[in-house]
Structure formats: C-alpha cells, structure tokens
Design a protein with these regions (language model features):
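Glycine-rich nucleotide/cofactor/substrate-binding loop typically near the N-terminus or early
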Residues: 29, 34-36, 42-99
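Glycine-rich anion/phosphate-binding loop at the beta-strand->alpha-helix junction
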Residues: 98-111
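Short, charged beta->alpha transition segments
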Residues: 11-14, 84-85, 110-111
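Conserved phosphate/anionic-ligand binding catalytic regions in large, soluble enzymes, centered on
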Residues: 23-37, 109-111
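A generic secondary-structure signal marking the coil-to-beta-strand transition
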Residues: 21-23, 58
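N- or domain-start disorder-to-order transition segments that initiate the globular core
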Residues: 1-21
Length: 111
C-alpha cells in the first residue's frame, strides 16, 4: 500500500530522530478520542508522551487530522482529538481509505 505524500505528515522531531537512528515510540490515539473523558484525555496523552521522553525516546502519536495522516502530533492536534465536538472516528486499517478520502479526523487503534 502506498500513500500520497500530501496525505502524510511526519512531525519534524520524529523525522529528525529517525534520520539520526534514534528511538521513536509509536502511540495509538484512541485513548484520547474514545478512551477517556475530556479534558483528562489530553492530560493523560501528554503524560504518556512525557513518559516516553523520560525513557529516552521520542513519542509519535499517530492520528488523522483533516484527512492527513500525522505521525507525531502538536499540542493543538492532541486537543482536536480530545474535543468531543471534533467528531473523531476510531480508525483501524480498514477505515483508512474512507476517513482520508472524506477529510475527516480519525484516532488510530491497533485492533
């Protein structure tokens, strides 16, 4: 499967770490949109990312924002996922195409 590069954004910190051969930890994002209530969801997501940093790696929370796959999120993007009004879809591999094509927001899951 290939993806149009316009629909994939790798956070600069994640990209730089990968280029240097550093440690990156991929994190699903459903805990933010579907796992915990707002505003605790965004707080817990930030704590998890900090725990990854404390362990010597860079966190790469993965989500779809406005039809673009994001690998590594900004604080504003975490907040979009955590906002109940953002209409975030729970996304597994079977849902990628429709969510991307519709330009929606999606939270990734490993299921």
């Amino acid at each position: 499967m290939s993806i149009d590069q316009a629909r994939l954004e790798i956070h600069p910190e994640v990209k730089e770490t990968l280029v240097k051969g550093g440690a990156v930890v991929a994190l699903e994002s459903t805990i933010i949109s579907h796992g915990l209530p707002s505003p605790r969801n965004v707080v817990v997501a930030a704590q998890i990312e900090q725990n990854v940093r404390d362990g010597g790696a860079i966190p790469a929370t993965i989500a779809i924002i406005g039809g673009v796959v994001k690998v590594g999120l900004s604080q504003a993007e975490l907040e979009i996922l955590g906002d109940p009004a953002s209409d975030v879809v729970k996304v597994s591999t079977r849902d990628l195409g429709p969510v991307l094509a519709a330009g929606r927001n999606g939270a990734t899951t490993v299921s």
